[in-house]
């Protein structure tokens, strides 16, 4: 999982990528290609 300052590029990397909020942090999850997971500080 990458830790990024901006998730704008992360959510456009794959068409299945979704932005979700968990525990006050913002995550990008990708079911079909999990190597595109990312988190914002």
UniProtKB/Swiss-Prot annotation:
Coiled coil (residue ranges): none
UniProt cross-references to PROSITE patterns, sorted A to Z: RIBOSOMAL_L36 (PS00828)
Keywords: Ribonucleoprotein, Ribosomal protein
Keyword Ribosomal protein applies: yes
One GO term (biological process): translation
InterPro entries: Ribosomal_bL36, Ribosomal_bL36_sp, Ribosomal_L36_bact
A Pfam match: Ribosomal_L36
An MF annotation (GO) of this entry: structural constituent of ribosome
Gene Ontology cellular component annotations, sorted alphabetically: ribonucleoprotein complex; ribosome
Stated family: Belongs to the bacterial ribosomal protein bL36 family.
Name of this protein: Large ribosomal subunit protein bL36B
Biological source species: Methylobacillus flagellatus (strain ATCC 51484 / DSM 6875 / VKM B-1610 / KT)
Biological classification of the source: Bacteria, Pseudomonadati, Pseudomonadota, Betaproteobacteria, Nitrosomonadales
């Amino acid at each position: 999982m990458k830790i990024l300052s901006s998730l704008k590029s992360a959510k456009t990397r794959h068409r299945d990528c979704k932005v979700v909020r968990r525990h006050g942090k913002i995550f990008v999850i990708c079911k079909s290609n999990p190597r595109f997971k990312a988190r914002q500080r």
